[in-house]
């Protein structure tokens, strides 16, 4: 369920309501592409997420413009293959070497009950990505000499709740419906130059 006083959100909610009649469920997301981009700073999201087999909530970021090297920053990603008391942080790097496309992933599991409110934080520096949960360090991804570093350009933020796909790889159960992600706030603090 979406609720907002903005006209754009109201239109989107009507579109979701219309689709409900034609499908068992609808995945949903909001993003900042073309509206707000982020580069170096502190991004905080206070939220609680739905859990259940096949439910796949995530807070993640992609480059505002395409091109190699390409990155993806997963601030929080949950699937029911792990306990409901764990979520994943991941940093993806895709590049070309000798004409071949290579992709590296760097997953890290974090113990936390995502169905409760938490503050998920990304601190983004020129040479590292630092991930925190409720102010506590969870993971740090450092720039390495000689390796691709696609985290030197603006990215946009995506918040979504999907059903199925990779998130359903350990099974699906629609008894978790209806479900919703509750976002209390999102804050961004830009680093001083």
Regions inferred by a protein language model and the residue ranges of each:
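Glycine-aromatic-enriched beta-strand/loop faces of beta-sandwich-type recognition domains
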Residues: 68-116, 168
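Short tryptophan-centered beta-strand motifs in secreted/extracellular beta-sheet-rich domains
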Residues: 43-45, 117-124, 129-131
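Beta-strand-rich interaction surfaces with strong enrichment in secreted/lumenal proteins
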Residues: 30-35, 105-111, 146
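Extracellular/periplasmic catalytic domains that process cell-envelope and extracellular macromolecules
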Residues: 9, 36-39, 66-69, 113, ...
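Single conserved hydrophobic/aromatic residue that forms the stacking wall/gate
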Residues: 1-12
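Secretory/extracellular carbohydrate-interaction modules
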Residues: 13-86
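Aromatic sugar-binding interfaces of carbohydrate-active proteins
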Residues: 112-115, 130-181, 191
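Extracellular beta-strand elements of beta-rich domains used
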Residues: 184-188
